[in-house]
């Protein structure tokens, strides 16, 4: 985007909801997948959660690193340039929780998503939590623009993968689906689902 700082440093509403869940489960170490410019990683870090932030964009990682330094959070937030379509760089059963805000809506096929979910399941400890948000099929942009196969649509150069509750259920192999909650974000507004899965 032409204004990479448009999200500012305010955390997403999804991160605020996730923090409450992390504290309920006494979770202290998380992996954020697709950390973007780091607004949620910083929020978790400032709330004493150790964060391992992954993103495939070098400029995003550079931006997070500057914010980590200026907020004195280098002991609590670690970044890594990484493409989440590859095997995640963590041991089996080693992570308390994963968080991703709209990562699953990127230009990922159903097969990519299943593979990502399997990897998240692999790295989570037993009873570990995966929280993710996705654009819903109730969203105003669904079925707009150029259809790119499955539930992927391209608008203004961006490809978005939209999710029904059924698609979310189909992605829960190895997990218990704790909750799927609808919420809205932004002025459009975007319509999303907030998904909480617990590793079985």
What is each PLM-predicted segment?
Residues 1-25, 30-77, 81-87, 129-200:
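Class I (Rossmann-like) S-adenosyl-L-methionine-dependent methyltransferase catalytic domain
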Residues 85-98:
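A short acidic, Gly/Pro-enriched loop at the edge of an enzyme's catalytic core
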Residues 106-107, 139:
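Short glycine-rich, flexible loops that bind phosphorylated cofactors or substrates
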Residues 107-119:
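A short, conserved alpha-helix within the catalytic core of class I
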Residues 119-126:
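Conserved helix-to-beta-strand junction in the class I
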